Amino acid sequence: MKLTAEQEDIINSRGDIKINAVAGSGKTTTIIEYAKTRPATAKILYLAFNKSVKLEAIKKFTAKGLSNVTVETAHSLAYKNIVFRHQYKVRVQGYKTHEIAELLGLQGNGEKHHEYVIANHINKFIALFCNSDKLKVQDVNYLETISDAKAKTFVKTFYHFIETQTRNLLAKMDRGEIEITHDFYLKKFQLQNPVLPFDYILFDEGQDASPAMLDIFLKQAATKVIVGDTHQQIYSWRYAVNSLEKTGFKTFDLSHSFRFGANIANLATQILFWKEAITETKPITIKGLGTNNDTKTKAVIGRTNLGLLLKAIEYVTEKKNIKQIYFEGNFNSYTYADEGASLYDVLNLQNNKQSLIKDALIRSMSTIKDLEEYIEKTEDGQLSMMLEIVKKYGNDIYNIIKTIKQKHVENNDKEKADIVFSTVHRCKGMEYDAVHLVKDFITEDKVNRQVHELENDEKKISK
């Protein structure tokens, strides 16, 4: 295939570089061609963002006969170096709030569910520290991540205790007394300052790298190439930083997209310019080289599982012409919060049917009011969304979910669906002809409110 001038410049480059690649710009092709033009004796590491990308990359590098390229994820590298060496046992799904409370022997203080609120913050504190590049828990300011006023007041009051118990839980993992999390072994790997035996390291999807991942990458002596799209960061909720903006490497752009034509490219360019209203951003002009096709896939995309489910419920109950639908991933996962509570647990709490509640945290609550107070003190957005759905639809939820499952088609019949539902994380890299965004993304009002709160906090500090 004929390469663009931008691709040629990257392939012929020398030294550490960063590549800002727009959607559909032939990023993978460019990386493969870059690897092909390095010396055959060079040891090359390609760092994929997740396992599915890793498996796809292995196929592509193998097909090109590039036996000198090793494909890993940051976690698979850490797993081999930490888990095997220390014979740790890994907890696949992480710890739930009630499990942390039990492991640490947290006690109530008279306030409702005090120990669970504390445990919830410990869980998030650990995630923040493990994804950071900091050396000690004390170096991380967890309070900065809290925006809700009631949650912030709670954390301020109990900060020292939350921090101490965060350290205690990490120490239990370190000693092998309990199973370790994926975040933990990556953090331990970063703290050991590993030296990776490669001449070149190609770091893909760099815009979603955590500070811990970036720290490992930047400390290597190898020639470093970081690739990504500064406008496609979707893992900031996992404390990712836009690593392309954190590196001082020479910058190359891949601005020609083969995925869509000029109309979409021009619209995308205009939308990206809007970012200048909230942050400093380098303008980029996208050139659409793609051609239209006859596929007419319609998709609804949300930020959260439950926000998407709420929109799907609206479609099923209000739009009678929708006969077949498809959810990217397992549909059942859309009715659960990350920690395990299901929509039915919250519904059973509202109906005072505690004996039917499976999740330990929800089962510990007596009323919906208890759940509302817990949500206020923890900023648990997923439980808040569940509560909203239960209050809006009540016992109709049973028949609504049943109807959704009846309309849902299997993977091999996806193209027959009238509409596809997906979160932004599950549909990354996929293509749809028409997209409707659910209103669960951050709004201008919320951005302005957070800026106002930050300015007020800064004024208080300066006094």
Where are these regions (language model features)?
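Conserved helicase motor core of SF1/SF2 NTP-dependent helicases
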Residues: 19-29, 49-52, 77, 195-196, ...
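Short, well-ordered alpha-helices that flank and scaffold nucleotide-derived cofactor binding pockets
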Residues: 33-40, 59-63, 187-191, 215-222, ...
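P-loop NTPase Walker
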Residues: 1-87, 269
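Conserved P-loop NTPase-based nucleic-acid remodeling module centered on helicase motor cores
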Residues: 51-126, 319-320, 325-333
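Short, surface-exposed amphipathic charged segments that create phosphate/polyanion-binding patches used
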Residues: 18, 82-92, 266-271, 338-348
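ATP-hydrolysis module of ASCE/P-loop NTPase motor domains
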Residues: 87-169, 352-377
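Conserved helicase C-terminal RecA-like lobe
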Residues: 344-463
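Conserved helicase/translocase P-loop NTPase motor core
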Residues: 2, 153-202, 208-219, 400-424
